[in-house]
Curated annotation (Swiss-Prot):
Residues 131-372 form the Radical SAM core domain. This is Ribosomal protein uS12 methylthiotransferase RimO. Keywords: 4Fe-4S, Cytoplasm, Iron, Iron-sulfur, Metal-binding, S-adenosyl-L-methionine, Transferase. The keyword Glycoprotein does not apply. The lineage of its organism: Bacteria, Pseudomonadati, Pseudomonadota, Betaproteobacteria, Burkholderiales. Catalyzes the methylthiolation of an aspartic acid residue of ribosomal protein uS12. One of its GO terms (cellular component) is cytosol. It comes from the Bacteria. SUPFAM superfamilies: Radical SAM enzymes. It comes from Cupriavidus necator (strain ATCC 17699 / DSM 428 / KCTC 22496 / NCIMB 10442 / H16 / Stanier 337) (Ralstonia eutropha). It holds the Pfam family UPF0004. It is found in: Cytoplasm.
Amino acid sequence: MGFVSLGCPKALVDSEQIITQLRAEGYAISGTYDGADLVVVNTCGFIDEAVQESLDAIGEALTENGKVIVTGCLGAKKDAAGHDIVSSVHPKVLAVTGPHALGEVMQAVHTHLPKPHDPFTDLVPAAGIKLTPKHYAYLKISEGCNHRCSFCIIPSMRGDLVSRPVAEVMLEAENLFKAGVKELLVISQDTSAYGVDVKYRTGFWNGRPLKTRMTELVAALGELAAQYGAWVRLHYVYPYPHVDEIIPLMSQGHVLPYLDVPLQHAHPDVLKRMKRPANAEKTMDRIRAWREICPELTIRSTFIAGFPGETEAEFQTLLDFIAEAELDRVGCFAYSPVEGATANDLPGALPDEVREERRARFMEVAEEVSARRLQRKVGQTLRVLVDEVNQDGGIGRSSADAPEIDGLVYIAPPERHAQRYRAGEFVDVKITGADGHDLWGAV
């Protein structure tokens, strides 16, 4: 690898980070153009003189080597007509990124000068070490949370929201798909807030600008997954207004019609004590609108029963909401004080037996709803990802079922050799039975 670094100390640090990553991945750094298989030019675009110096350096690298990736401030700069300056002057460059774009630069390097994977010398595969079955994986897009829910201490442990660079996220997703992952589960503490901390900064992926924002990321992940015949599933989607933008993507098949939205409660006074959005009526309207746009949508949520000060009337509001909203998958926890949570200081703490009794009543209603909704699937043919095959047949999951937390689809043993299936494969299953949690069917 050849490297040219121009500009201010901030650009120098960017160069150091890129070179560090290159060396960590086994790329050697050449001091000459003719000794390099590829050249990275980190540019400056602050003043006209710096722009010209950067353009000259790019031209020299193209003349002397011919394979050039451009990064830095000039990479993000446009001319009066709105065209990228670098691409307009030097159309032969292989890729262009803006500043502070380690992920985008490395993705371009991997595209144009792949480092061969040698199983005898490389101890870590490109997709990384995973503890899940090889056909599904979790993709964390951010760390931390900006909310201060009174029952939660995650911000004190993990800090405020820090979004991963969008190109870094996309590169990891691509590596996972290449490694055979058939289901990508997008996670974070607050998936909907992705990019808020960087003001939805525009990054680059495959030579195209891509905003650091949930809607744009989900669309790009869906497009990438389609190339590998894979699923994308969204988790921990805080109910911001822009979540409404995701539903059309689900109805169009870009990502699974599955939304994990942690609602926590339905009574406005309880939600206020929780420091959560406090308009259950609006939430119900949104759920109706989502299902109108995407009728096959599965909604999962989690709730807390027995929160400090919760009255029987407030709890009944929650039960009524669950029955009316007909949420497909729910989990409910009896409130438990967590050391450091501000909810511990709220008046009206309920006895353990009351909290547990309310949780049990909640789950009774939720299971009745689940049984009704699952019964409607009998007779349908569902696409199922097989997780396991044994002598009794197969066990898999439909688009409505996330691993570990939702239901399963039990698949009868194949009657013919042509119907045989393996773990990690998709099969079409005719549903023949259902209970309150799981489905049964045959290929």
